[in-house]
Amino acid sequence: MATHDSKQLEILQYIYDTVENRGFPPTVREICAAVGLSSTSTVHGHLTRLERKGYLIKDATKPRALEITHAGLDALGIKPKDIPVIGVVTAGQPILAVQDVEDYFPLPPNLASDAGELFMLRVHGTSMINAGILNGDYVIVRKQTTAQNGEIVVAMTDDGEATVKRFFKEDLHYRLQPENDAMDPIILNHVQILGKVVGLYRTNID
């Protein structure tokens, strides 16, 4: 049994290393070659057992969708990174940004390869509902000061207030566009980008 456990941990470690190095998990054949197994069915068996142990999540609809859970990281002796939750950001009527860390949130394994500095902000309002960002959601943000047109960003307005909007640089101004047909864009001569939204966490599902 110990041999099976060690082989499973070897497979888990290889999946982790591959995602860290290239950003996506290996194929079953790559796992075979890496851990010295000749049968893909044997690897599938190990992956199923890792899933039963709660170390791995597989998506049956995607051939290479393997995600290591926090329990899996613990089994490998890897401490998950934590994302600081910083104040509240408004999607709708902006409010003053609060640059205080309120809490820490475990880094989702699918963002483990993100090289940037991440933080989270809680969204209040409905201005981004067409983009699937709802009131009370937490946006995961990569800290950066630039953005491409059409990207969803956290931006600071001229009044020193933070808001989540879709970013557009136009000829004479910047446009922070809501994803809600009932709301108007914010037009600014100057804008400070705090970061790009790279993920979303929802605590309540209605």
UniProtKB/Swiss-Prot annotation:
Catalytic site: S127 (for autocatalytic cleavage activity), K165 (for autocatalytic cleavage activity)
Known DNA-binding region: 28-48
EC number: 3.4.21.88
Residues marked Cleavage (site): A91, G92
SUPFAM superfamilies found in the cross-reference section: LexA/Signal peptidase, Winged helix' DNA-binding domain
Family note: Belongs to the peptidase S24 family.
Protein name: LexA repressor
